[in-house]
A protein has these predicted regions:
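Short, surface-exposed ligand-recognition loops at beta-strand->loop->(often short) alpha-helix junctions
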Residues: 11-23
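An amphipathic, aromatic/His-enriched active-site/gating alpha helix that lines ligand/cofactor pockets
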Residues: 22-40, 59-95
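Short beta-strand segments and strand-loop junctions that repeat across beta-rich extracellular domains
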Residues: 10-11, 71
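Residues that cap or initiate secondary-structure elements
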Residues: 14-16, 60-62, 100
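Long, low-complexity, Ser/Thr/Gly/Pro-rich intrinsically disordered segments that act as flexible linkers
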Residues: 12, 49, 87-109
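Short beta-strand micro-motifs enriched in acidic
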Residues: 44-45
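Short, structured motif recognition centered on aromatic/hydrophobic residues
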Residues: 4-9, 20, 31-32, 51-56
Length: 109
């Protein structure tokens, strides 16, 4: 069975990497999980603390769009970590691919 996998890469403003990771680990990822979003992996890049990745998995691209639209429209997100996260991001890149479930599970940390 295939999963739709979204890979987000962020270039963060200089000096915000540790703060960003704390917000992700303590607030954003638990919020994602409460909304039923499968966060496969996330963290700072090994080469630069101000580079970050977030990998999320979904049943299909349609499911991804529905779930993320609902999540980003929620008061939990808008009144929660949204501003702290957006303020740290200088640029972002999004890639969406289909992977076998076993490959997705291999990315989990």
């Amino acid at each position: 069975m295939m999963k739709t996998v979204e890979i987000l890469q962020y270039n963060l403003h200089k000096g915000t990497g540790a703060f960003f990771h704390n917000v992700m680990a303590e607030i954003s990822v638990p919020l994602h999980q409460r909304h039923g979003i499968d966060v496969v992996s996330f963290g700072n890049s090994l080469h630069d603390l101000n580079c970050y990745y977030l990998i999320r998995a979904f049943e299909s691209i349609e499911n991804m769009n529905t779930v993320l639209n609902s999540f980003y429209a929620s008061a939990d997100w808008r009144c929660g970590p949204r501003e702290s996260i957006i303020d740290c991001i200088e640029t972002s890149i999004k890639t969406v691919i289909d992977l076998p479930r076993v490959s997705v599970d291999g990315l989990r940390v």
